[in-house]
Regions:
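Short, well-ordered alpha-helices that flank and scaffold nucleotide-derived cofactor binding pockets
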Residues: 12-16, 125-128, 160
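Short beta-strand/loop motif that positions the catalytic acidic residue
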Residues: 103, 109-111
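Glycine-rich nucleophile elbow surrounding the catalytic serine of serine-hydrolase chemistry
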Residues: 1-9
């Protein structure tokens, strides 16, 4: 489960738990085909994860700051195949609960303009479920980009939300 899954579950079960929330790049629409392909693909390709050249390709596709590569590579090498498969399956199969509509939290939903269409659909779905929410499409941003690569912009949005 990713961090936003925990947040969405908590908001779904405890509508009064917080006053404000930020949800960034959350996938809440199950991807059935992807889910079915995860195990066979990772059974075949897991051995590549510890190869530095492959990690560099993966890292580049994530659009992270170059200064984060050493940490990324170190963490990636520690992930077991079973944990990676479980994580990917959980992520691709998550479906937001309708009880999310009961939350009272003022919520900012962020998604990058350069994210995949399913991520934008997920953001829209969340905004339709949460009564006091706002969607912000971040122009030129990729998946998870603002909190990782543009922390100052992220902090400004947090400050605006809690005012």
């Amino acid at each position: 489960m990713e961090g936003y899954h925990f947040l969405l579950e908590i908001l779904s079960k405890n509508p009064d738990i917080c006053e404000c929330a930020i949800i960034e790049s959350a996938l809440v629409i199950p991807m059935d085909f992807t889910y079915k392909m995860i195990e066979p693909i990772f059974n075949l390709s897991y051995c590549l994860i510890s190869k530095k050249w492959f990690s560099k390709l993966q890292f580049k596709s994530l659009k992270l700051k170059k200064s984060l590569f050493a940490l990324y590579y170190e963490d990636t090498c520690k992930i077991t195949k079973d944990n990676l498969i479980a994580f990917m399956k959980s992520n691709s199969n998550y479906e937001v609960k309708n009880t999310l509509s009961h939350t009272k939290a003022k919520t900012l939903v962020l998604v990058g303009s350069k994210e995949r269409p399913i991520m934008k659909k997920s953001a829209t779905k969340i905004v339709h479920l949460i009564p006091n929410s706002e969607l912000e499409v971040l122009q030129g941003y990729y998946h998870g980009d603002i909190s990782i690569n543009h922390a100052d912009d992220y902090v400004e949005r947090v400050k605006r939300l809690v005012r």
